[in-house]
Curated annotation (Swiss-Prot):
Protein name in UniProt: Exodeoxyribonuclease 7 small subunit
InterPro entries: Exonuc_VII_S (IPR003761), Exonuc_VII_ssu_sf (IPR037004)
Family: Belongs to the XseB family.
Superkingdom of origin: Bacteria
Compositional bias of kind Acidic residues: 130-139
Subcellular location: Cytoplasm
UniProt gene name: xseB
Pfam families recorded: Exonuc_VII_S
Amino acid sequence: MAKKKRNPSAEEAGDGEQTAAELGDFETTLGDVETIVRKLESGALTLDDSLKQYEVAVAKMRQCYQLLDVAERKISVLAGVDAEGRPVTEPLENMSGGESLVQKQASRGKRRGAVAPDHSASDTTGVDSADLDSAEDDE
């Protein structure tokens, strides 16, 4: 009896998660996508071949995104040091805390002793008040 060929697009359509080893190497997969893009941009392929290559590239991009998801889940961020001097880590997703980038910048600045920039809506003209004072003195 003949062996069935593997159909990667059918496997990806399933709900089961794949490990990084099953997905392959990110750099190699991304390199494959870049090679396909160069072929498509060259214009040397027929329409049918171009569509087939496009489908392969889309499947490989999905594979790249899955590899990035696996890598992101593995990343942990240093949260501090315990009483015995050992590093304490937290998963990456726990570190965001729902803060905006401006809030994170302000809290980081406070820890470093810097003054956070004023992003208030009161000065929306873009004109510095010192410039206005000097303009009045000129009159």
